[in-house]
């Protein structure tokens, strides 16, 4: 063991060497030499065994490394073997036997080394030759397979081209050919590249083989080659087609920002197409739904169980009880009996606790009758006075209705929808609803316009059982994100509050669009304080066998409101308002109603000057400001509010004590809602109404409201109404009642359509699009201006310069200017005497035909004859015939009519003498706007038009404001155009028309702060 170890460990060998030296120095030399020979033989055998092991290890390394690594490894091994042999030779004893053994070992090693090197080199060459043969064979197979595939691809392309002969897109065919040529060139380049660098191709194939081995698809060497060739066929086809397809996609330049910028600069955007697409996209959700194709979940409507106490009541007792509840009247079969306490309506304990917490002691008359009717699953029309608790009447049955159904899941719409006409009323109902929804774990979302839509969309996506909305914003929500925000598929309970306003002509399309998208077997409830008969017919279209509950008559002011009507002049209204505010301002909050937004802002300034802090509320204020103003008014931060009728509906302020109608309401329902803001929930209130003599037509509605509510009617109001009726009767006019809000909405009739077309034409003309192809048959702006001109054309004949026959011609035509021109004439020349005689004979013949004597000659003829005879003009006596002719001329001038006899006389006079025509035209500009009149009547404009057209233009007549007619002998302001050339008159008229048109366009598109909130179409 010790001898073997000294051949492998240096320390052991040194230790052995020192031991051998000590032995050599020993006296027993024979024994020492014998041992040394034995050791040398053992050493040589071990050296040979080690060389064989090294050869085996080198062979294993050759298989694992590349050719370059193998060469380096062999050189390193040779250097190591030499160093080891030298080291071991130094370790041997220095005697003669050891030297001989060393020489033998070296000779053996030198004989073995060439053999070992030759073996390694031959093995490497053999491996390289075999590998090269395999690569060449594989390349040949690949080349054949690729050529076959190219032929098949070409055939397919030819077949595709033949199949697309019908196409007219020659550019696409050229692109296909170019792409095919590029494809073949790319394949050739790849083949050339494979010849240049075969090692890369081989390594790729090795990777493919490894993948196939892992998948277990290759079972042998032959199978491996075949599978490899098949795989490459598929690879060739895919690698050639996929880049081609991606290249075609890349031509769209969708992800290239530079290309996108370029396209946006060069291409024109069709705004009309984009708008149409957007509107169509919005309408997709709101189109009528085919409910027969949708399978809705069943639900329960009837939850009402009549308690024994009510069941024992006889019909007579029920009638008496309804009479006690302010005279409830019920229409419809099967209406339940009215309840007496909250417990009898069948609501949960949580709702009862909420009612107790918010001091709802017992049901009001409308609640007592409406709640059991709705709980029974019936559709309802509820009519009750303002402040009677209509909101609770439809909220409590709604909670019971919702809790009976399964919870709202993800991406599902609400179960109940409450629609209101105003944003303020929507917020108020939401606030009232949240008093109960928190304890019932229900979610309420208020959807209204004027605010950001993103927050409301986020709330709807989280899910809600109840939506309180205005119709316009609800339609926007249904169309947002292709209908993914919310839907109406699970809606089973629909409430329309202030139903008469909702079914106004302006709200009806939006309301019907929403209702038609709800399932047909829904439960629909309507409430309002006023419900005209015309609106009732519209409402019944969406109701199914409704029950009508009416409390206290239709449209009646609450008896708790003390009403006063004051007939007053317009100038004294503000002072009277200050007097009323002095009495009531300290007692509570006050609302002052006006009719227009600008009047609200003006009255606000006047009150601020009078040291009354106040705020104004109208539709022109931003929604956030409106919300804050109402909150401040309800909280008592500001106790005086100036508002339009936007605040007249649904606004509930506890401490409101006074309502002042500064502008008289224009119909009965508006008065009821204004006065109904005070005197709510049994509190005392006061209502003052100012009416002027010019507003006598509204006095009948105020008189009716006072009589129906049981208030005293002032004698001045009765006298005002009586005088108005007598005046209308004397004029032969019929007095019509103006009930309802129908006059405020869009009518969607031909008049509004015509106004919209006119506004569209004005905009097109301003943008230079007046020659577009979509012009309709409506009057354009040029025809409107022409009709307002009320043009009058005349053609007058005058004698040529130097002619003496002007007197006769002027006498025939009746021209005054001819007389003024005759004053400068001298004795007629000899050449004109003959023509003068012909004119005299013609005049005598005409007089003889008409049986007229010398006394019948008109003033112009007498003056002409006197001048021709050389005498003086004597003031003529005015006969009855002359007066009649003057009256006839006035009528003819007003009607722009020329008698036939006069035309015949002018024609004969023109034939008898050489005359010069003068063309005249009158353009009436009295009815145009002031700026338009100024523009065409300025000195610079008239001078420029005269120089351009070579016509004389003068301003005549007097300006008369609208509604005032000129007196006899006067005319409205007009422009008189005179010229000897008809073309000059036409050019002057065209230039005047152009100037007026430009001014009208400017006025149409300019901002006019004085008419804020109202628009006037010229």
UniProtKB/Swiss-Prot annotation:
Biased composition (Acidic residues): 113-125, 169-200
Source organism, top-level taxon: Eukaryota
Record EC number: 3.6.4.13
Compositionally biased spans, kind Basic and acidic residues: 25-39, 88-112, 126-168
Biased composition (Low complexity): 15-24
Protein name: Probable ATP-dependent RNA helicase DDX46
Class of the enzyme per the UniProt entry, highest EC level: hydrolase
Motif (DEAD box): 497-500
GO cellular component: Cajal body; nuclear speck; nucleus; U2-type spliceosomal complex
The species this protein was found in: Danio rerio (Zebrafish)
Cellular compartment(s): Nucleus speckle; Nucleus, Cajal body
PANTHER family the UniProt entry points to: ATP-DEPENDENT RNA HELICASE DBP3
